[in-house]
Swiss-Prot record:
Top-rank taxon: Bacteria
Keywords: Plasmid
Listed InterPro entries: GrpB/CoaE (IPR007344), NT_sf (IPR043519)
Protein name per the record: Glutamate-rich protein GrpB
One Pfam family matching this protein: GrpB
Assigned protein family: Belongs to the UPF0157 (GrpB) family.
Taxonomic path: Bacteria, Bacillati, Bacillota, Bacilli, Bacillales
Species annotation: Alkalihalophilus pseudofirmus (strain ATCC BAA-2126 / JCM 17055 / OF4)
């Protein structure tokens, strides 16, 4: 299963298929926006071995400058199912989502476009790598995610905000 409807919080068992799906998407993105991109990495819970995750592939796209987003071929991105979420206002980040169902707003992939090796880039990569290197911490994170998914099954915003405290604590320890 890949994809979650807008606002829903659903966790599924980790799938080895997520890496293959990321690799396929990375190749597609390189043909569409590759000229402006320094690196493309999978991150988020689908990139952490052995833990449950929302079945959405988070993709980190590193660019020299966020102004490079203006050079993206938005028409080709839309043809591939990606839409720029211009209403998502996060300082230092531009967000695109791939939808397989526009009626239910079913997201399968989220592109987080950030400055390559800037703060966002380094934090996302460091957190992923730390959890993959520390299975006990990744299981603690999984437990938190399960509790929050039960608490907020239809409130993705609250789910994400409460997870942030754990992420920030880990990043501060590193």
């Amino acid at each position: 299963m890949l994809g979650v409807n807008k606002g829903e919080v659903i966790l599924v068992t980790h799938s080895e298929n997520w890496k293959r799906l990321f690799d396929k998407e990375k190749s597609l993105l390189e043909t569409i926006i590759g000229e402006q991109v320094k690196d493309i990495q999978q991150f988020g819970s689908t990139a952490i071995k052995g833990i449950e995750a929302k079945p959405i592939i988070d993709i980190l796209v590193g660019v020299e400058s966020l102004k490079d987003v203006e050079k993206f071929n938005n028409e080709r991105l839309k043809e591939a199912g990606y839409y720029h979420l211009s209403r998502v206002q996060i300082d230092g980040k531009e967000v695109f989502a791939k939808f397989t169902d526009l009626e239910n707003l079913t997201k399968t992939h989220i592109l987080h476009v950030v400055e390559y090796q800037g703060d966002w880039w380094n934090e996302h990569i460091s957190f992923r790598d730390y959890l993959n290197a520390n299975p006990l911490v990744s299981k603690e994170y999984e437990s938190l995610k399960k509790n929050l998914a039960e608490k907020y099954p239809n409130d993705e915003h609250s789910y994400t905000n409460e997870k942030k405290q754990f992420v920030d604590e880990i990043l501060n320890e590193m």
